[in-house]
């Protein structure tokens, strides 16, 4: 496995931008270095689609903009996109045989905005099929391997994104988070990742899984890098019905606030300029009970102790419905998935069976051949809970529970704490294939991330140590904020990363 030499030489996004501005390196050189590194690290299976001609054309355009003084804030920065975002030029498959060879006629808003800012895409990254999974083992194109230990999963569903960033193949990557799919792979691969408040980043052009839960978010080595990306990615999009418009910043009755795209930067500046003395960190007792591995607990506790040294105080809080987030999520998300994936029928686009009798057989065979086991499992669950006679008993009850989970968070933020911290995943990365006999065991790995997703809150993962038998599998600290508190979360993560070096560590080369 080979890291991009130029990328690691210059460091994060700000350092890369400075090097590009000073002509110490060109965008073409960075892009070619990244392409070479991606090829050398092909054993990780992080990339699904690479087109050097497209990448180098973007790099040449970035160099021209830099020379003309018209460059955007990310001009020449090498990134890559999760294969859940449609892209013009690169194929988009969502990790599924159903979309094998699909060519989108347009870019997703996230892709479009990053391109307008000058970022150079190295290609499309592997992911769990239709973003359904916690280990990136559900991709139709094979599992992604964790750069820290290639026997291990990278987390999912944005496993290719986390692996590419951890291996320093790219400066940053996009991901999607429905129930933890940015935070969990970020934690297991030792990088930083953030799920913004639901509605702050456009979902237009993001292949839908659970529409009331899906949210795009970036992954990068540091929180400062995340801020650079989030500043470009956020903002109202009239093409997305769930996109939030800017307003005066007053909270409504649910505690939500609608703000413009500059809110993260403003919150970051405000929080970053204040001492941490007196900051109340809520520590949910439910996050530190049975099921949490001792090595993960120790790393997270050490991170909390570091925040205490910076002046913050720990405050015990309770999120009593934490475990109930699992059944609530696995009713709501499959229900929405069964509706969203109904469009893949072999008629309009997607895989079509080669042999069939009538139209009904064509549709059923196309879906049976095109979808993998995990996707079929969730479609069946979703169809069942939405069926006549079960809708009230399951789906409506899950939605009521969702509201109660959100209220638990709001009570904690209103009366007890400023932010909430705890683990991202109950264990370090498992080995590939460990849960092959019980695929639903992966669902339990999301116990600390699902509640945040159901509530629509922002949360992030930052690397905070290592665990596992050989001590080389990363652990992530989850930082959860109130609605539209992305700036504060990023500022707190930055304060932590100023006094620790976990985010600067990269995996050593190893055979994949």
Swiss-Prot record:
GO terms, biological process: translation
Molecular function terms from GO: ATP binding; glutaminyl-tRNA synthase (glutamine-hydrolyzing) activity
Database matches in InterPro entries: Amidase, Amidase_CS, Amidase_dom, AS_sf, GatA
Active site: 82 (charge relay system), 157 (charge relay system), 181 (acyl-ester intermediate)
EC number: 6.3.5.7
The protein's enzyme class: ligase
Pfam family, one: Amidase
Biological role: Allows the formation of correctly charged Gln-tRNA(Gln) through the transamidation of misacylated Glu-tRNA(Gln) in organisms which lack glutaminyl-tRNA synthetase. The reaction takes place in the presence of glutamine and ATP through an activated gamma-phospho-Glu-tRNA(Gln).
Subunit structure: Heterotrimer of A, B and C subunits.
Family, similarity comment: Belongs to the amidase family. GatA subfamily.
NCBIfam families recorded: gatA
Protein name, as recorded: Glutamyl-tRNA(Gln) amidotransferase subunit A
Gene name tied to this protein: gatA
